[in-house]
């Protein structure tokens, strides 16, 4: 390491005319440098005492030189110190002390009767100026009148606490305030004692204490547990054990009368899950979660309803699990139909919607059931007898055949029609639906197909039959074709020949145009191949010229290449990976 050289430093003025005189830096000899290094090594090994700063503190010899050396602009005297590495006092934040706190209440001062210099010209307070005054502007300010001077505002100090000061729960607490509570309790205690002394004096005057002292129980040391005297004398003890029975610890009971603790021991007769079936191939027991999900008696052939424990899987289907699954299914179906509901995002809305849906569904089923029963009947079939009478004996005799048909006894009811029976309107002698023809219903008496038409009798039948005959004749005439003349046949033949000639001409034109297009494409491809060869030749010549002598010509074109140019490029490009590329030029 080379010797440190201190540059010349201009003397800084200190205390007026005095100047700090600095010694000229001397160059270290090789011997001094060696001694200095040996001393540093001895200090690091602990054989030599460490350096001491101006405060008498030892300097750790293991601190590097770039940390321990003092900069010339801080201390030119080059004394050994670490003061420049410590926090500088002028840069430290000044925090409020723990005793400082905000003012509570208003300080009562004497009334000011004279205007003070620097006070508000309007009201006379010292804590603000005229432009910041909140009072109503006076006609003549307090500066000139000197009367009715307002008191100074209660200004709170600006406190800035450190980390501990902000979290000090007792900061600003005045212990003298607690003395008020102590005095209040002392007064209550004094009142209790005076009342107690007054009661004792009254009992002594009435002679009750003398009778209790002369009683045989008191002479033998026995005391009446429920006497008023014992209650009065032991009131303080009762206050201590007043709530002792209400705060029992789990597993024990505290008796305040006898002051003993009674343990509640519980006999455990339950069996551990892993001891129910010792077969290693039975249900798996998870020691981490203490769970056995499967039934341990599954391979033993026991009924799961008869055993005391059938696995933990039954919990998955208890409680609200099934209802929650139904709610989730309803949410999915409602979301598919356009409702913005979600089980996790808005469970309350989904629950209310699902409840209203179930109520509406039940109402709809009841309405549908009632409407069907009103229309078709059959309420008596729904009123089934009790279950115990379904397979019991009855007095109704029914005889069946081999095929299940009823031979004797209960007859099968005839199916009722949806139309009203035996209701004849508008002079009809038959009901509606008694006549059917060509997919339409009508009246048999007049062959009318209109339900609310009047009956026409046999005349209506004849009219309908005559209309049908006329319609059949018209359709028959139209179906017979008129015979064509020779002239008409000749004209049709000429038209067909013209059509055939036109088709042949169109085919010929298409074939000729296709051949012309192929020739044009071939010529364009030939021109594109020639242009591609010229371009490749130009590139080859340009690459042979020295880089410094090559012309700077941009080969970029803005137009899009044609299909023939792309085909020529594909045909002429080099393919080094193609094994047959060498035979292309031959």
Swiss-Prot record:
Q: Which domain of life is it from?
A: Eukaryota
An example of a Pfam family matching this protein is Slu7
Which parts of the sequence are CCHC-type zinc fingers? 118-135
For this chain, the site of the Glycyl lysine isopeptide (Lys-Gly) (interchain with G-Cter in SUMO2) cross-link is 349, 408
Compositional bias of kind Basic and acidic residues = 20-44, 529-550, 557-578
Q: In chain numbering, where does the motif Bipartite nuclear localization signal fall?
A: 129-169
Composition skew (Basic residues), residue ranges: 498-510
Annotated region described as Disordered, given as residue ranges: 1-63, 77-100, 206-254, 496-586
Disulfides per UniProt = none
Report the outcome of residue 166 to N.
Answer: Abolishes nuclear localization
- Impact when changing residue 116 to N: Abolishes nuclear localization
Q: Which InterPro entries match?
A: Slu7_dom, Splicing_factor_SLU7
Modified residue annotations for N-acetylserine: 2
Task performed by this protein: Required for pre-mRNA splicing as component of the spliceosome. Participates in the second catalytic step of pre-mRNA splicing, when the free hydroxyl group of exon I attacks the 3'-splice site to generate spliced mRNA and the excised lariat intron. Required for holding exon 1 properly in the spliceosome and for correct AG identification when more than one possible AG exists in 3'-splicing site region. May be involved in the activation of proximal AG. Probably also involved in alternative splicing regulation.
Assembly: Component of pre-catalytic, catalytic and post-catalytic spliceosomes. Associates with the spliceosome prior to recognition of the 3'-splice site for step II, probably during catalysis of step I.
> Which family is annotated?
Belongs to the SLU7 family.
Q: What is known of its domains?
A: The CCHC-type zinc finger is required to retain the protein within the nucleus and prevent its shuttle back to the cytoplasm via the CRM1 pathway.
From the Swiss-Prot or TrEMBL record, give the protein name: Pre-mRNA-splicing factor SLU7
**Species annotation:** Homo sapiens
The gene designation is SLU7
């Amino acid at each position: 390491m080379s010797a440190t050289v201190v540059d010349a430093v201009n003397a800084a003025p200190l205390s007026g005319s005095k100047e700090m005189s600095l010694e000229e830096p001397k160059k270290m000899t090789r011997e001094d440098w060696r001694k200095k290094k040996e001393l540093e090594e001895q200090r690091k090994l602990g054989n030599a005492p460490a350096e001491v700063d101006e405060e008498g503190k030892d300097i750790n010899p293991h601190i590097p030189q770039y940390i321990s050396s003092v900069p010339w602009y801080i201390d030119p005297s080059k004394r050994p110190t670490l003061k420049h590495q410590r926090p500088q006092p002028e840069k430290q934040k000044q925090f409020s002390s723990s005793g400082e706190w905000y003012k509570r209440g208003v300080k009562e001062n004497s009334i000011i009767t004279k205007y003070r210099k620097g006070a508000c010209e309007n009201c006379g307070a010292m804590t603000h100026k005229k432009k910041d005054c909140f009072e109503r502007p006076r006609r003549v300010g307090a500066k000139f009148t000197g009367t009715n001077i307002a008191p100074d505002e209660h200004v709170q100090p600006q406190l800035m606490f450190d980390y501990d000061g902000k979290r000090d729960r007792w900061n600003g607490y005045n212990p003298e305030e607690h003395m008020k509570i102590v005095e209040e309790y002392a007064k209550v205690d004094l009142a209790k004692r005076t009342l107690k002394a007054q009661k004792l004096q009254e009992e002594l005057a009435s002679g009750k204490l003398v009778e209790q002292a002369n009683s045989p129980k008191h002479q033998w040391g026995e005391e009446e547990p429920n006497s008023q005297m014992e209650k009065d004398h032991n009131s303080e003890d009762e206050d201590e054990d007043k709530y002792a029975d209400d705060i029992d610890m789990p597993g024990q009971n505290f008796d305040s009368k006898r002051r003993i603790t009674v343990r509640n021991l519980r006999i455990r007769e339950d069996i551990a899950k892993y001891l129910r079936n010792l077969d290693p191939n039975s249900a798996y027991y998870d020691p981490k979660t203490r769970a056995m999900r499967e039934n341990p008696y599954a391979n033993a052939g026991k009924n799961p309803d008869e055993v005391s424990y059938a696995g933990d899987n039954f919990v998955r289907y208890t409680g609200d699990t099934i209802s929650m699954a139904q709610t989730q299914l309803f949410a999915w179906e409602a979301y598919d139909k356009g409702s913005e509901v979600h089980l996790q995002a808005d469970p309350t809305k989904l629950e209310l919607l699902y409840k209203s849906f179930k109520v509406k569904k039940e109402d709809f089923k009841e309405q549908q059931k009632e409407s069907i029963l009103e229309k078709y009947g059959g309420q008596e079939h729904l009123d089934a007898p009790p279950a115990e009478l379904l397979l019991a004996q009855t007095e109704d005799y029914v005889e069946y055949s081999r095929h299940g048909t009823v031979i004797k006894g209960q007859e099968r009811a005839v199916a009722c029609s949806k139309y009203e029976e035996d209701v004849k309107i508008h002079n009809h002698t038959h009901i509606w639906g008694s006549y059917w023809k060509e997919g339409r219903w009508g009246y048999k008496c007049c062959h009318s197909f209109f339900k609310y038409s009047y009956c026409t009798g046999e005349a209506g039948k004849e009219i309908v039959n005559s209309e049908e005959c006329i319609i059949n004749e018209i359709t028959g005439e139209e179906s017979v074709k008129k015979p064509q003349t020779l002239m008409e046949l000749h004209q049709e033949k000429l038209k067909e020949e013209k059509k055939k000639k036109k088709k042949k001409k169109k085919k010929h034109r298409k074939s000729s145009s296709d051949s012309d297009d192929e020739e044009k494409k071939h010529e364009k491809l030939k021109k594109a191949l020639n242009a591609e060869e010229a371009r490749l030749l130009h590139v080859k010549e340009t690459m042979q010229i020295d880089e410094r002598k090559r012309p700077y010509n941009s080969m970029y074109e803005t137009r899009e290449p044609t299909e023939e140019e792309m085909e020529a490029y594909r045909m002429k490009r080099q393919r080094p990976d193609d094994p047959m590329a060498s035979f292309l030029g031959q």
